[in-house]
């Protein structure tokens, strides 16, 4: 760490001195500090304190002497511990040295040996402040100059007693030695052993924060946000409540010299804070109060944490800095206690400031007291900002309290994940986090300032207020901001992609936020107003002026920042639930404005929101609880910080367990989460709290930041690695995944659901809608997405039921898979509910809220996947938002997680979607039973089986068979039982709504049976299912939108296009795309799961399932589309759906072709997004289209046909998808089933409006498949219903068949109109070889494909005309045959022939009403089979 220290030193021309003095520990601190300082400087913060921290002990003492003199003066006046305090200050210097350089710890303190262990923490804390705050030995550097300015300012105030301070500093240690010896040692050993080192680090941070705070209130705003956040909030909330906080926060270190500690802590913190922030006169009263506090603190020393909180609360009234101490002490001592006490306080106050709330609990006077104190304290340094200080004082009080509460949580959150907050470490995990604390803490500094800088700018009003207000406020602001931001930042750092994506999404979300759902915005505003009103009394309007409660997004941001950076983030993130824009801004705000939101506010508010939801059952309550949550958030955060504080923490039913679980869950999570996953993600996640409740946590959440913070974790459950996604963490999720994450997820999910349910009661219906949209955007914030689903489900007990089901299943799965499952389940089932509910609510399709984490939280994880994936997500989003916000939302969310995460994640999603939806409908019990049954299979089997369980025929044939019995409608013979039963069971067992899902599921299930040895039965089942479920699907289309807890989610994905063909035209695209993804994820995942369990032997368990998954996805699309009308329309729709990526643009329109494919097909390109497509979504759609267009432009024929292709790619893409997905699924199944297979779809979907990327890969066979009647590149499919011809431009099939070579990125044009044999043969190898990057060995397949393609094309010509039914049947057949062929023939030729033969047999049974289907099916199957075989045989 010397390097970093040297950096600081060099920068300050103090390297030699520092280098010589600092030991490893000091260097470590210095290095971290230096980095943090640089970051802070970058973030427009003069945080040279970090560098100063590196200052040698002597300098530390010097600075401390001067610095401490003032502080000690305060403390002495206050607590009359002058002798103790100065000596303690010296000790602190020693401590700073100790922390910075352990040797100095001994060498730098004469009395150190005396009170070395006990006072060390205190010393460190105080000393670090001196060292960090006031290292005067670095005057050369600009930082040094700034520090000098601070010193001068401070000196001007403390020069009167600089000497006195210093000598007392020396005197104090002896006094402190006994005190610390007794109390600190006890507390230190019991809970602060780790704090001992951490406090020094935090102390340094705090002092650094405070010194700039003194010098530059604004600088402190940025620097202190992290520094103060770390120091003040971590263990140096004592900066605000030096004595109280130090005592409370570091009850052991500071409680030891309780008598002198208040002074000392006060002196140290006040030194850096009050000296710079407040006048000495103001400090004297404070010192007296602190003295009292110190007196109280010693008593609380033994309880350390509890006493800490109590003392802190008691001192807190005198100084709101106590709030941080209290909160953090509470956090440290007992999450429950904090939750009980601080939360109770918070709840009663209903303020955003946990500190204020705590004060209210401890004493209503504290609120005014801190104001008074702060006002007096602020004048000298903050007098120029006194105008604001009146507000800021209150706000600082609020801020400090909020930050204290949130700081503790943020610190907690951070300290666990980043372990940057010593206090948090000391308090919550005093022993464990301390070690980690140093790096995370400094990293937070590094990261926080940048985002806080944004955030500060964002909440310039409030942030300056924060800076301006008294040091406690500043410290709190910074501290709170820092925990959150640092966490977030760490998360973001961990998930750089998340940050990038988040920035993009932030813009989108801001767009969505402001243009998306006025109602929700209004609601959010109202909620904010209420919260602000509640906080207002505490902050005396600081929030109002700074955070303008009236302005929901911006002012909330500012308001909360006014409260404290974290608070500012909290409001935006809290309110985003109410305001999609805010969630969107929130998720991304979390990422952009600050991980603070994701971290501290997220969690604090998330937890608070959750509790508020439980208690208030309304957004306002939740927002209200924001502060309360902050107050007790530390508890939740305590457990969750490592997981996905940001995203998950938001919804924490149980403070620690639930919060932790949630944190893990979503961030994992939001997402960003996560979610910024997005990391957070943990993706992760009331606006924000509600969002978090709605699972904006990050997911992934993040929150996104959570990922980093916690894993640096992953945002929240899903977003954390970007926000908790498999890439989320379950994809790059924040969790130290595995057991903890799962538990957290479970907690979080359940709590979130409950929260959301209650939130709904609070009129969050709109919010839900908004959050649905939001979530869409913040899929990265899987938590958000989950939260959204949960919000919608909160009114549905089923949501919890599903979630539990999901959790049950997820628990069985592997840790990562579990995470993914939970996320997936969350998202899936929540999404199912959300989808339905969103449709019911018909929320404005603001895609502000989807990110995560996936972690599923935002798109971060997926974005992390290929760029195409993000594009796809926008397409999905757009479509989803347009036609069925929920549907698209869910679809896109689920697919993303699958893409981002493993099949496990995907499976859980589907699982939950299917299972949740099913239980919602009629099969809750059965689904549960199935899920449990499936749960028997651990890992993928369990996950997939569980999904299958959702689908009645999950477990291979057995569940299907029983399900067949269960579903009266199951007319498929037992041989088709697996798939048929799944379909029928779902169709028959559940109503049409359920049927829709079952279709998907059957699609999934069918592949298993079909793949293995039931292709014929499966096909008949498919045919039948197409008919019955087709009807049901249609039927369900309407209900799907209506009923909130429907199985529709999967069916919605599959049916979204079908049922919502008019209104869901766009949904069709998203549905297609989502179905595609969802099929891929939900049906595919389930399919995959069933296949995996069932076909473990037939296929390579994973490959077949994987291929089947895609295939099934296509099949599901086919079934739903084809069976909906059981017409070409359905087939067309299936096609539309099938080309999820390829059809995304086209599918947007075809999306609605489930009922009227023609219409959407017409709209496909231009009106691909039907009704309400938020500009953001539109943008995403456009972007996807652009990508597709580029490819098409490369091969202009493709581009032209892109338009006609819009209609065409759907059917064609279905074929492609069926075949293509099968191949990718099949093969990737073996390799990395979900990820691999998903990325192609992602490419397909996101890249295009036509499955060009997909086409590229599987395009060879696919394009060959379309080759039949029309040019290989174009497949003209007629919608029998509308009679409209859709030219599906298959990326690899244009009139001049243009094959896209993914490897070279070039388009190979081969004229393959009718001469499929001649033209297609040569190109297919090229196309296959080139376009099929994934399947380079496709060349043989192309030949095979060409052979079938000829048949296909021959059959296809008629098929196009009678494509509707035929294509539908063909697709189903193709799926069946495809699977059958895959199972039957691994060889390309075998594939072609068997598919042709098998397809026909399957075709007729599959679609009894579709006689002509055989031809199209043959073509499709040929491609599919070829691809599959190519994948299977060639690979």
From Swiss-Prot:
<feature type="region of interest" description="Disordered">
    <location>
        <begin position="1138"/>
        <end position="1261"/>
    </location>
</feature>
<feature type="region of interest" description="Disordered">
    <location>
        <begin position="1363"/>
        <end position="1435"/>
    </location>
</feature>
<feature type="region of interest" description="Disordered">
    <location>
        <begin position="362"/>
        <end position="592"/>
    </location>
</feature>
<feature type="region of interest" description="Disordered">
    <location>
        <begin position="795"/>
        <end position="847"/>
    </location>
</feature>
<feature type="compositionally biased region" description="Basic and acidic residues">
    <location>
        <begin position="751"/>
        <end position="772"/>
    </location>
</feature>
<feature type="compositionally biased region" description="Basic and acidic residues">
    <location>
        <begin position="1194"/>
        <end position="1211"/>
    </location>
</feature>
<feature type="region of interest" description="Disordered">
    <location>
        <begin position="291"/>
        <end position="311"/>
    </location>
</feature>
<dbReference type="GO" id="GO:0003007">
    <property type="term" value="P:heart morphogenesis"/>
</dbReference>
<feature type="region of interest" description="Disordered">
    <location>
        <begin position="109"/>
        <end position="176"/>
    </location>
</feature>
<feature type="compositionally biased region" description="Polar residues">
    <location>
        <begin position="1094"/>
        <end position="1105"/>
    </location>
</feature>
<feature type="compositionally biased region" description="Polar residues">
    <location>
        <begin position="1067"/>
        <end position="1082"/>
    </location>
</feature>
<dbReference type="GO" id="GO:0086003">
    <property type="term" value="P:cardiac muscle cell contraction"/>
</dbReference>
<feature type="compositionally biased region" description="Basic and acidic residues">
    <location>
        <begin position="522"/>
        <end position="535"/>
    </location>
</feature>
<feature type="compositionally biased region" description="Basic and acidic residues">
    <location>
        <begin position="149"/>
        <end position="160"/>
    </location>
</feature>
<dbReference type="GO" id="GO:0055007">
    <property type="term" value="P:cardiac muscle cell differentiation"/>
</dbReference>
<dbReference type="InterPro" id="IPR052303">
    <property type="entry name" value="CEFIP"/>
</dbReference>
<feature type="compositionally biased region" description="Acidic residues">
    <location>
        <begin position="1424"/>
        <end position="1435"/>
    </location>
</feature>
<keyword id="KW-0597">Phosphoprotein</keyword>
<feature type="compositionally biased region" description="Polar residues">
    <location>
        <begin position="668"/>
        <end position="679"/>
    </location>
</feature>
<feature type="compositionally biased region" description="Basic and acidic residues">
    <location>
        <begin position="650"/>
        <end position="667"/>
    </location>
</feature>
<feature type="compositionally biased region" description="Low complexity">
    <location>
        <begin position="1083"/>
        <end position="1093"/>
    </location>
</feature>
<feature type="modified residue" description="Phosphothreonine">
    <location>
        <position position="120"/>
    </location>
</feature>
<feature type="compositionally biased region" description="Basic residues">
    <location>
        <begin position="1182"/>
        <end position="1193"/>
    </location>
</feature>
<feature type="compositionally biased region" description="Low complexity">
    <location>
        <begin position="1055"/>
        <end position="1066"/>
    </location>
</feature>
<comment type="subunit">
    <text>Interacts with FHL2.</text>
</comment>
<feature type="modified residue" description="Phosphoserine">
    <location>
        <position position="323"/>
    </location>
</feature>
<feature type="region of interest" description="Disordered">
    <location>
        <begin position="609"/>
        <end position="772"/>
    </location>
</feature>
<dbReference type="GO" id="GO:0070886">
    <property type="term" value="P:positive regulation of calcineurin-NFAT signaling cascade"/>
</dbReference>
<feature type="compositionally biased region" description="Polar residues">
    <location>
        <begin position="133"/>
        <end position="147"/>
    </location>
</feature>
<dbReference type="Pfam" id="PF15232">
    <property type="entry name" value="DUF4585"/>
</dbReference>
<feature type="compositionally biased region" description="Low complexity">
    <location>
        <begin position="727"/>
        <end position="741"/>
    </location>
</feature>
<feature type="compositionally biased region" description="Basic and acidic residues">
    <location>
        <begin position="609"/>
        <end position="620"/>
    </location>
</feature>
<feature type="compositionally biased region" description="Basic and acidic residues">
    <location>
        <begin position="389"/>
        <end position="402"/>
    </location>
</feature>
<feature type="modified residue" description="Phosphoserine">
    <location>
        <position position="470"/>
    </location>
</feature>
<feature type="region of interest" description="Disordered">
    <location>
        <begin position="250"/>
        <end position="270"/>
    </location>
</feature>
<feature type="region of interest" description="Disordered">
    <location>
        <begin position="1007"/>
        <end position="1108"/>
    </location>
</feature>
<keyword id="KW-0963">Cytoplasm</keyword>
<feature type="modified residue" description="Phosphoserine">
    <location>
        <position position="816"/>
    </location>
</feature>
<dbReference type="InterPro" id="IPR027838">
    <property type="entry name" value="DUF4585"/>
</dbReference>
<protein>
    <recommendedName>
        <fullName>Cardiac-enriched FHL2-interacting protein</fullName>
    </recommendedName>
</protein>
<feature type="compositionally biased region" description="Polar residues">
    <location>
        <begin position="831"/>
        <end position="847"/>
    </location>
</feature>
<feature type="compositionally biased region" description="Basic and acidic residues">
    <location>
        <begin position="479"/>
        <end position="493"/>
    </location>
</feature>
